[in-house]
Amino acid sequence: MFKSMAIAAFSLSSLLVAPLASANWQVNNEQSKVSFVSIKKNSIAEAHHFKKLSGGLNEQGQLKLMIDLTSVETLIPIRNERMTKLLFETHEFPNAILTADLSKTLATLKSGQHVLKGLKAELDFHGNKKELTIDVLANMSPKGDVTVSSLTPVIINASDFKVTEGISELQKLAGLPSIATAVPVTFSLTLDKEK
């Protein structure tokens, strides 16, 4: 479906929003969502999502999102089971972990203000890590909660994470002529400011 990056030094202008530096935020699972689309038979697209997300954003602007792969929801129980066992292999890789440096975003984010960034991130999925560049929309509510959403889908290629064999297994079991190995992923995260 994220090589640690050095924390960017705040510019002089970031001192104007220095109070943010003392905050921590936690992912609100109920108000957050990570979704992906699978395409079978070349043209049949189906949307799926994960029901359990956790993680947070610390005062240095480092984001960590943990996706519980056992919580995949495709609306078909047998497909959920096959994905967890054959594709994700959750007995060995129960989570996908996305890390990103939001320090520059936090430095310029004010209450109610939206900031678009080409965010550098790293996805750790199925024992493999890959750097990603994500376009995001960020917002801070008047009470200090932060939302971070994908502006465009993030394309995850199965070959980058060595899950093409799992896709082939799913294809055989379902009797399908094809399942796409490039998957668009979208996300919307709400991070509650700690009291």
Role assignments for model-derived ranges:
Residues 1-9:
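Bacterial N-terminal signal peptides that target proteins for export
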Residues 22-195:
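Low-complexity, acidic/polar, glycine-enriched regions of mature
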